[in-house]
From Swiss-Prot:
Record has Membrane as a keyword: no
HAMAP family associated with the record: GTPase_MnmE
Protein family: Belongs to the TRAFAC class TrmE-Era-EngA-EngB-Septin-like GTPase superfamily. TrmE GTPase family.
Function: Exhibits a very high intrinsic GTPase hydrolysis rate. Involved in the addition of a carboxymethylaminomethyl (cmnm) group at the wobble position (U34) of certain tRNAs, forming tRNA-cmnm(5)s(2)U34.
Record's protein name: tRNA modification GTPase MnmE
EC assignment: 3.6.-.-
A GO term for molecular function: metal ion binding
Compartments (UniProt record): Cytoplasm
Domain TrmE-type G: 215-376
NCBIfam families to which the protein is assigned, alphabetical: mnmE_trmE_thdF (TIGR00450), PRK05291.1-3 (NF003661), small_GTP (TIGR00231)
Gene Ontology cellular component annotations, sorted alphabetically: cytosol
UniProt-annotated binding residues for Mg(2+): 229, 250
Amino acid sequence: MTTDTIVAQATAPGRGGVGIVRVSGPAAEQVAEIVLGKLPRVRYAEYLPFKDEQGQPLDQGIALLFKAPNSFTGEDVLELQGHGGPVIMDMLVRRILQIKGLRPARPGEFSERAFMNDKLDLAQAEAIADLIEASSEQAARSAMHSLQGQFSSKIQQLVESLIRLRIYVEAAIDFPDEEIDFLSDGKVAGDLYAIMAELDGVRSEAKQGALLREGMKVVIAGRPNAGKSSLLNALAGRESAIVTEIAGTTRDVLREHIHLDGMPLHIIDTAGLRDTLDKVEQIGIERAWAEIEQADRVLFMVDGTTTDAIDPREIWPEFVDRLPKDIGLTVVRNKADLTGEDLAPSQELGHAVYRISAKTELGLPALREHLKACMGFQGNTEGGFMARRRHLDALERAAERLLVAKDQLEIYVAGELVAEELRLAQESLSEITGEFSSDDLLGRIFSSFCIGK
């Protein structure tokens, strides 16, 4: 248990109708007596003045006192709900910090204390931040499911299955002289395959949850005047980029964040790529390449009125040579309203090819479906949970350990090695909920939270 008491504004900075200051720790009752002049009844809302050091009212509002362990943090907690002006909030926090033993809360420290006091696990704590940062209704619902423990429950079920299997395997190791060969009787293999299948299902759900949180970065690239900015505007549904007939109009990177069926898509329009003596345009082109090299997918825009080619290497071999091999490339032939070409998508020389008109939006629905498929979108995410990159990494490590355990069982019938791989898989899964996590990992996670959360 911590011995110090922390304070911070729990509501967002800025002006609002209501602002909340939260205090957590053993001195919460002392703060109440000093600032309120009395100890409020536990878990009852009382309308009281908030007093300065001279006993004069700073503000008046609702005071709520929670006693450990029945609070968000598991400690004594005092919440003061006053008027949400930034000056009032700052005065109230500074007044509380004058009390001996009080200090400002670090980012995420209230959630960290809730985790340390077993009020929620690590995945649930992260879900609080994800719920606040949700950029769509689907993302908010998924974060709420994680906060309610849906993701953690699935992980706990996997961990418990691994523990039961480990007990069985280790019993076979400890009693090798029994008439029955426990490692070869089919139970271990059957249970292991069932756990692997269950883990695959959780991994698939987690990938969808990570997509809801992180989305996909798509860069629109190509020669000047190919229609890149027009495509950005069409996908965004508004005039985000200036469009003219003058080559080189876009000189800097333009960003738009849209949602396709709830999945966030980060679209980036770049300067047209060409050799130029214009210093400003050169800077824009270098920035364009910096974005291209970090993309999840590149939409390679081609002016369909200038060439019939669909192979990007034929259109621009230097571009293909410079593009990192692990980045997906989609050829987008623009101005189909002028060329009259068939809009049917095709697969040519390892690249998807889409014919569109960014101006009239011909072919755009098919391109949107293609982008969803590139993200790995699997349809309705209702009932899913939110996941982060570290969760996917932990699930991947667990799956790798189980594959090794499968080989150790099937090829070598090595009980000790099977048990060790099961232990390592369990350890990886336990990192997700925080049952097995280093202090450094916890510090990185909670430091990314808002102050007051």
